[in-house]
């Protein structure tokens, strides 16, 4: 199923979509207002998220897609968002080109241990339709479309779409500047929904595309497939959870293979659409922070 978190008249609500019908699960159980609530109760009941949701749909109100789009927020209240780097060959090549120390990216691409780094807190993460940010002290910024792994207590409970906005100029000055290039206000967006593993036959065989518009014209449009990843989702989760007390809910962004080439620079007023097969489209405008 596809799960959306909504904010309606100041209240949280959770919906589930199946066979072109969307159900307001909160109307069936007022205690279930977030995806985390549903996953927690499913775990206690020793059932799957989808099975519990299916039972709730019998007593739930039906809502239309326009209602969901109008009120959608981030699809999961992740306490932490992490990201993986150099998981596609093209990202390794792009970071070599930008860096004063290119060999280190080639080494990570072929290493046993993946690059996994902290990306965002809830306050730095924007919802679908809101504006992602580019740093005012950066000269070269790019959106990075990525498959997001949704975790509950370190276990995969779903997938979403993520945008890992990055300053390539700051990271390119020195790899030690990576936290400043990656972590700042409005540096990340996830959405529009969480899709459970039961509805994703293979997360490593998903079409992914990104379109960027400026002043009403498309200035970037490209597509790829997650089959180009050199790391598996299970591998990234394994390294994330090793010797690490992980939060109740977290998201891992799995890296990108769609990298706009120079002289492209993400600017205030641009509009970014990222689509992943079977999940949906994450749309954001751009602002300067």
UniProtKB/Swiss-Prot annotation:
What's the protein here called? Probable 2-keto-3-deoxyxylonate dehydratase
Explain the induction of this protein. Transcriptionally up-regulated by both L-arabinose and D-xylose via the pentose-specific regulator XacR.
Functional pathway: Carbohydrate metabolism; D-xylose degradation
Catalytic reaction(s) noted = 2-dehydro-3-deoxy-D-arabinonate = 2,5-dioxopentanoate + H2O
Q: Does the keyword Translocase apply?
A: no
Q: Which GO terms describe its molecular function?
A: lyase activity; metal ion binding
GO annotations under biological process? D-xylose catabolic process
List the EC numbers from the record. Answer: 4.2.1.141
